[in-house]
């Protein structure tokens, strides 16, 4: 859901990726990024 809500990208900032990364960190992962509309966490 984090990738849908803020799903815009610009040359300087991608808030959807930041939201996804934060979501993953809260869940105990190292971070994450959006791929299309799905947030993928890094282990």
UniProtKB/Swiss-Prot annotation:
Lineage top rank: taxon: Eukaryota
InterPro entries: Defensin_invertebrate/fungal (IPR001542), Scorpion_toxin-like (IPR003614), Scorpion_toxin-like_sf (IPR036574)
CC annotations in GO: extracellular region
Keyword Ion transport: no
UniProt entry keywords in alphabetical sequence: Antibiotic, Antimicrobial, Defensin, Disulfide bond, Immunity, Innate immunity, Secreted
Cellular compartment(s): Secreted
GO biological process, alphabetically ordered: defense response to bacterium; innate immune response
Disulfide bridges in this chain: 3-34, 20-39, 24-41
Pfam families: Defensin_2
Family of this protein: Belongs to the invertebrate defensin family. Type 1 subfamily.
Function: Antibacterial peptide. Affects Gram-positive bacteria M.luteus, B.megaterium, A.viridans, S.aureus and S.saprophyticus. Moderate activity against P.acidilactici and B.subtilis QB935. Also affects Gram-negative bacterium, D22 form of E.coli.
Protein name: Defensin
């Amino acid at each position: 859901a984090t990738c849908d809500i803020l799903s815009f990208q610009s040359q300087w900032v991608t808030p959807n990726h930041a939201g996804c990364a934060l979501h993953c960190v809260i869940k105990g992962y190292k971070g994450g990024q959006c791929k299309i509309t799905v947030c993928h966490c890094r282990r």
